[in-house]
């Protein structure tokens, strides 16, 4: 356990070396305090990480958009309704 002031919540109590947010939260730190700490510790020290995270976020957004579109398409075409009919559920149970 470290005995220096915590870099997230500023507490003079010993915080775990890995600086878990749950410990600091119990001492009054907010999520924005933790995000600011995370940004200072990791992002500002590695400029390449910022562009990587931005690209990753864009890919995740595209993936969620594609999932939403597929879900809408299946609902419009009745695919979900066909799979969820009681007769098909009973048929599946009988085959098992």
Curated annotation (Swiss-Prot):
Record GO biological process: transport of virus in host, cell to cell
Region Disordered, annotated ranges: 76-96
Keywords from the named record: Transport, Viral movement protein
Role noted for this protein: May be involved in the viral transport within, and between cells.
Listed name of the protein: Putative movement protein
